[in-house]
Amino acid sequence: MKETKTIQIEVPADKKAEWQEVGGKTVLVMVDEKDNRPVTERIKTFEDACNELGEDHPMVSVYDALVTRANGEQSLAEWMGKDVVAFLKLRIITEALNEGWHPKFTEDEYRYYPWFYIYTKEEYDNFSEEEKRRCVGRAFDSANARGGLVYSYALNGVRLAFSNRDLAEYAGRQFIDIWADFVFEISDNENEEDDE
């Protein structure tokens, strides 16, 4: 039996040391530590989604470049609109949650999207002004924006499609503020028109 000895090495937090066969020799290498928790436990924030994909992922790179060019996310929203910033974020979130799944457009394929609830006029009337501002129905005399929202899920397109119902529901609930900025947000110009 070969004699062994113990050594201690420091390994970065996101890596692990692993013995591997390389060129006929056994060597100790550092490899990325894989988080095996379900994706819905790993991705709770937009930042989590960016980290899951990595800074070199094209969607993350584009977002970071635009934020840098605009001198911050707030300036980017002023430059391009909150809905555009929200779309960029939702692309990243969707890509991360789908873990490599992309629609193939086959006849038997299902794609899922978040679905948002329409409030009754009574429920709407009990909202704060800020809550009312975030509802699609505020532009109508009635808060029942039936024609305004019932079909809007189909307008999300395949870029924001999920591989299963659970992921779509999770994304809609967990990232509701980002979805609201994408789907429902009213620009300041539209607010001024409503006040007239």
Located regions from the model:
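Short aromatic-glycine-(Arg/Gly/Cys) micro-motifs in beta-strand/loop hairpins
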Residues: 108-157
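A short, charged, amphipathic alpha-helix used as a generic interaction element across diverse proteins
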Residues: 163-177
